[in-house]
Amino acid sequence: MTRTLEKVLSRNLIHLGQRIFLFLLMVDQIPEHLVSAAVLVIWMFQFMLEKPLYLSQLENRFIMATENDKSSNEIEKEATTPSPLTPVPKPTTEDKRWGLNGRLAFAIAAAALGSSFQHGYNTGVVNAPQQLIENWISDLKMNRTGQVTKQSEVTMIWAIAVSIFCVGGMIGGSLVGSIADRFGRKGGLLLNNILVLLTVIFEGCAKAAKSYEMIIIGRFLIGINAGLNAGLAPMYLSEISPIHLRGAVGTVYQLVITMSILVSQILGLEQILGTDDQWPLLLCLTIVPAIFQVVTLPLCPESPKYLLLSKGKDMEAQRALAWLRGTIEVHDEMEEMRTEYESVKLVPKVTLKELFVNPSLRIPLMIAIMVMFAQQLSGINAVMFFSTKIFTMAQLDKTAAQNATMAVGAMNVVMTFVSLILVEKAGRKTLLLAGFSGMFIDTALLAICLAFADTSRAAAYSSIVLVMTFVILFATGPGSIPWFLVSELFNQSARPAATSVAIAVNWTANFIVSIGFLPLQEALGAYVFIIFAALQAFFVFFIYKKVPETKNKTMEEISSMFRQISYQ
């Protein structure tokens, strides 16, 4: 029945794409490059939904390659005994090098580049062409009404277009659990790209159709996409990673976000795509990572933990794990998953209500919620918003200030990469404490320096240094760890529901900051950063008291720890 429904859905979606293509051909005003892009996108989703023959052949070749590595005795034993082979000793530190191989790296790239790139790119892409799009909206409204458009009206429309991205993120985040359970982590990521297609159609055709409402709809749809990606991608990355690489692989999600924000800043320059004619193309480039993911992710297996713990497919989970590890010596990991599977079978599927009622689940849920609040209420968005103004205060001209802002973005990328290395050495809790403690001191000093920046060159230059330092501190832990920490705190049965709550909270906090920062900044000036400093001090105390260290711990060990705490 399920396969029949999937075939009907695939057929209907392909027919919908063909009708959209015919519509684009009939509308003369639509630029040719958008029609060409539509052809490519429709083929892309036909590729994803119909699963061409050569893709199946490639998958079979991967499976056969794994099977050929087995000896005849192993194959005979596997055929007669579905249970695992005798566990081998746990790998030593020297043996752990096999954990990262070409196939695992390929799966990480397919999942992260196609998902978190959407998140970061669409966060930053609207900044550079803001004035161009506002002018277009103003002219459009004047043509509609025959009256000069008030700047306040244009500002309101633009604010809605920007902030509705967060509203979409809240909705997408709340859907993570149901999508992850229904379609799987990999399947959910692939289907999520349909929203990217719709976004490109709306945003790419908005100027030709003379409708700023299409920009708002597109931003809303890509917000839902980003919200789903923020839950599904870290979940998939966490579940396919060896235990000793789980933190490093989880950090990749934030690393790609910082990279994509930097890419959006560069492409938005006036010398590249930041022009009246090219800004629709700038918005439409979000389709590129979607195409990459739709082509590459089908070659990767579904999460082994999802296959075994959620679907009970032992052999498929073992094949997927062998593919990801590049070796058939996966019996130890399979034993750990089977142990978790036996414990999961003893309890019913975790509901949203159960998360708040069960003490052993409520404690990690509160931790997950607080670290998500901490990330967004740390003041990073406010500092990034203020960065260009701070550089201008230091008497840098407009071009130099823009270049300095991009340098901050580049530093964010570099330091997030550094955190990818540190997270498995220093641990999650240590990096969170170091990051938020340093940010507390930095933010308090930044508020003081900004208050005197207009009259003191020394204060203005000190502000630049403090902004750079703030970004470094944020990138070393608070920026990346919350995304994957949620997946580490919960077992398989509770993870989808808990991730839905945590991601929805993250986007809600993001929305609160985006809406509330400007009014507070107008009322308090530079002293608005004192609020962020106070919040950071609270988060340091909370992390020190409540957040456990999850480095190198299995899911069963973490769950057992929370059960013991709940009984105390």
Where do the PLM segments sit?
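Alpha-helical transmembrane bundle of multi-pass membrane proteins
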Residues: T2-E6, L13, F21, V27, ...
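Short linear segments in intrinsically disordered or otherwise low-structure-confidence regions
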Residues: E32-H33
